[in-house]
Swiss-Prot record:
Serotonin binds at residues 103, 107. Keywords: Cell membrane, Disulfide bond, G-protein coupled receptor, Glycoprotein, Membrane, Receptor, Transducer, Transmembrane, Transmembrane helix. It comes from Homo sapiens. Changing residue 337 to A: Decreased binding to lasmiditan drug. It is a multi-pass membrane protein. GO terms for biological process: adenylate cyclase-inhibiting G protein-coupled receptor signaling pathway; adenylate cyclase-inhibiting serotonin receptor signaling pathway; chemical synaptic transmission; G protein-coupled receptor signaling pathway, coupled to cyclic nucleotide second messenger. GO terms for molecular function: G protein-coupled serotonin receptor activity; Gi/o-coupled serotonin receptor activity; neurotransmitter receptor activity; serotonin binding; serotonin receptor activity. One of its GO terms (cellular component) is synapse. This is 5-hydroxytryptamine receptor 1F.
């Protein structure tokens, strides 16, 4: 998002020459991140469009998130790279206003999409039957529209407050001179969505864990009932078959060969039942770990990428004596942009349908 840059007009030619290698390295690194973000989000969008199996309301939210992150990559990152390398804004205040508008709106919209996806998954797990009826493309479209509208309402006021102060032609930043504007923008764009995401994913994990345990208990109970029925029917059917055979055996031999066979079968069936139950427990545990890993990656990436930036925004603009270097400000801004690269990876890498769709797209391009 916004950050402070200084002019390099006072630097000598020798100093500029010495700083050139580092500028080239920074430019190439950031350009590579922008290109990767553009490519990966393009793949997600294309996969959802061309793959009929992915035409699901839940994936429409992911597609909209990918579009938002794609806009960050093509409309926000390139201008930021030029600003960082040049160390001054050279494109005029009109372009500055447009860039800041797109920057704040798209980054806010990306964060709010994560909240919408969390809400969608929460309702799909906790109210599966009823929500399956409501989970239509129209419903997904309404959610996406609401996300964009809220993003605009959160993003626009800071831009109006920006013009209340004096701005230099060589800088493109938003100075939060009012505590109200700082709290409004940071809490609306991050802290409130963060709280919502944490609460929803905690409830999702608890609900998924409870659901796994209920299904496991139901399957074990069903197996025990079926096993008892099979055992009783087996005993009844074997009585008539074994009558003539048993009569031919000596009365002094209380244990017939058939009794031994029947005992062996029951023993094997019992062992098989316990083995099957153990395998189901192992699968259930694996699913729980996978669910926890997925949720951990989603929350971890989101918090690591955006929390430092918004802590900086809140502290620096509320505390007059608190300062931060230009390099650190740029780093925190790009750490937030990095979330637009990570989002499509996390939300699709655990989905087999997406993997197959990506493979088909790559083969077609090759």
């Amino acid at each position: 998002m916004d950050f402070l840059n200084s002019s390099d007009q006072n630097l000598t030619s020798e100093e500029l020459l010495n700083r050139m290698p580092s500028k080239i390295l920074v430019s190439l690194t950031l350009s590579g991140l922008a290109l990767m973000t553009t490519t990966i989000n393009s793949l997600v969008i294309a996969a959802i469009i061309v793959t009929r199996k992915l035409h699901h309301p839940a994936n429409y939210l992911i597609c909209s998130l990918a579009v938002t992150d794609f806009l960050v990559a093509v409309l926000v990152m390139p201008f930021s790279i030029v600003y960082i390398v040049r160390e001054s804004w050279i494109m005029g205040q009109v372009v500055c206003d447009i860039w800041l508008s797109v920057d704040i709106t798209c980054c806010t919209c990306s964060i709010l999409h994560l909240s919408a996806i969390a809400l969608d998954r929460y309702r799909a797990i906790t109210d599966a039957v009823e929500y399956a009826r409501k989970r239509t493309p129209k419903h997904a479209g309404i959610m996406i529209t609401i996300v964009w509208i809220i993003s605009v309402f959160i993003s626009m006021p800071p831009l109006f407050w920006r013009h209340q102060g004096t701005s230099r032609d060589d800088e493109c930043i938003i100075k939060h001179d009012h505590i109200v504007s700082t709290i409004y923008s940071t809490f609306g764009a991050f802290y409130i969505p963060l709280a919502l995401i944490l609460i929803l994913y905690y409830k999702i994990y608890r609900a998924a864990k409870t659901l796994y345990h209920k299904r496991q208990a139901s399957r074990i109970a069903k197996e025990e009932v079926n096993g008892q029925v099979l055992l009783e029917s087996g005993e009844k059917s074997t009585k008539s078959v074994s009558t003539s055979y048993v009569l031919e055996k000596s009365l002094s031999d209380p244990s017939t060969d058939f009794d031994k066979i029947h005992s062996t079968v029951r023993s094997l069936r019992s062992e098989f039942k316990h083995e099957k139950s153990w395998r189901r427990q192992k699968i259930s545990g694996t699913r729980e770990r996978k669910a926890a890993t997925t949720l951990g990656l989603i929350l971890g990436a989101f918090v690591i990428c955006w929390l430092p930036f918004f802590v900086k925004e809140l502290v620096v603009n509320v505390c007059d004596k608190c300062k931060i270097s230009e390099e650190m400000s740029n780093f925190l801004a790009w750490l937030g942009y990095l979330n637009s690269l990570i989002n499509p990876l996390i939300y699709t890498i655990f989905n087999e349908d997406f993997k197959k769709a990506f493979q088909k797209l790559v083969r077609c391009r090759c």
